[in-house]
Amino acid sequence: MADESNTGPVAAAVAADAEVKVPTAKKLRSPRPQKAAAEPAQPKAPAAKPRRYSEQERNDKLKLIETQVSEGNTLKNAIQSAGISEQTYYHWKGAAKPVGKKDAKSTKPLPAGDEFADLVKLEEENQKLRKRLAEKLRTENAELRKRLGLD
């Protein structure tokens, strides 16, 4: 209890701290420089209409790109030298593929009846082979049990 009644030095320390802390005036900063006045935007030249290439021009550019690539240039450089974008190149390349290649598989008629009969035969053969394998495994298992004396 003696410690609670002895408040003299603590009160003196608090009073000393209060005297030391004197508020100081804020530092003044120089004003910000004015932003440069925005110049009015120059209207851009109207975008030119996209160039339309004829089929002959497209094929010529595709051949040019192919020859440059075969000479050792990269595909990207060859496309840039032709003056077209990569997307345009791939679009033209896809459109230039002969249609016969895409439909070659579908033009050959598939005999549905023959394939179904073959499928049925294969399924039957598969079942026979599975039964044979199961029988063989059972006999081997029985022999091993006899050898080990588990039966």
UniProtKB/Swiss-Prot annotation:
Region (Disordered): 1-61
Biased composition (Basic and acidic residues): 52-61
Gene Ontology MF terms in the entry: DNA binding; transposase activity
Key words of the record: Nodulation, Plasmid, Repressor, Transcription, Transcription regulation
Compositionally biased spans, kind Low complexity: 33-48
GO term, biological process aspect, one: DNA transposition
Family membership: Belongs to the SyrB family.
Function (record text): Responsible for the repression of SyrM activity.
Name this polypeptide is given: Transcriptional regulator SyrB
Biological source species: Rhizobium meliloti (strain 1021) (Ensifer meliloti)
Organism taxonomic ancestry: Bacteria, Pseudomonadati, Pseudomonadota, Alphaproteobacteria, Hyphomicrobiales
